[in-house]
A protein has these predicted regions:
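Asp-box/BNR beta-propeller blade signature and adjacent active/binding-site loops
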Residues: 1-254
Length: 254
């Protein structure tokens, strides 16, 4: 569970976190200050279990309240080479609407410091309709395999938003060739959490134990707030990377 107190005075891993990096700051239409940062838990490096905190102040910075805009928590609130990472948040204010964009790295991936899991060029990660491409996890290759093995997998499936989408049941996985929904009786919500009816699957599509995994690259992950940073919407994935690019990264700041 996420700690009740976020910003403490000491870098002490016994309190569940130690470090924050990559700040961003904007002023909302009502004058509120909105700040975002990586929660880097017990490391300073990139990847391997990072999340996103957003703080807001309505009194010109005298006091602050925070929320966790992006959080998966796979493998606990700590460094783990098999974990996902939300990294490098960037903020954009458009009146009272605030947009938060960051890079989402699937389980184990990083750009500069991952010998086994470097992000790969060779695919945008999406089909021609902008749907997230997926490969079936097997004993041979899955969401925790090396990025080389993942890149060589067959991406025969895609994630498609349902016609009758709700927050609890938003997406379905379809076969690229037949457009049929895959077996497994899965429910996938608007944050890409996936569960099976029999309880055997209860994870997120970007975590290492997903039944269907993505091409090993980063994904542009965007949420928005329409109440000056108090709450945040379900995410949208944006297809912006070229096949020849290893990654397409957000430049954080103000």
């Amino acid at each position: 569970p996420f700690p009740k107190t976020l910003f403490l005075e000491e870098h002490n891993s016994s309190k569940g976190f130690t470090r924050f990096r990559i700040p961003a700051l904007v002023t909302a239409g009502n004058g509120a200050l909105i700040a975002a940062t990586d929660i880097r838990w017990d490391i300073c490096g990139d990847g391997a279990g990072l999340d996103t905190a957003v703080s807001r102040s309505t009194d010109n910075g005298a006091t602050w309240s925070y929320t966790v805009a992006n959080y998966l928590g796979d493998n606990g609130n700590r460094f783990n080479r098999d974990s996902t990472a939300f990294i490098d948040p960037a903020l954009l204010a458009d009146g009272d609407t605030i947009y938060l964009a960051c890079d989402l790295l699937p389980a184990g991936l990083a750009v500069a410091n991952a010998a086994r899991y470097p992000a790969k060029a060779g695919s945008t990660g999406y089909d021609t309709n902008g749907n997230l491409l997926l490969a079936l996890s097997t004993t041979s290759v899955n969401g925790l395999s090396s990025s080389t093995a993942r890149a060589a997998a067959s991406y025969d499936y895609h994630l498609e938003k349902k016609a009758d989408a709700t927050s609890e049941s938003c997406y379905e996985i379809k076969n690229n060739s037949t457009s049929e929904v895959v077996d497994g009786d899965y429910t996938i919500d608007d944050h890409f959490n996936i569960k099976s009816a029999d309880g055997a699957v209860d994870t997120n599509l970007f975590c290492g134990d997903t039944p269907y995994f993505q091409f090993p690259t980063d994904f542009l992950y965007i949420t928005k707030s329409t109440d000056n940073g108090a709450t945040w919407s379900a995410p949208q994935l944006v297809d912006a990377k070229n096949e020849s690019e290893q990654v397409f990264l957000i430049g954080p700041g103000r």
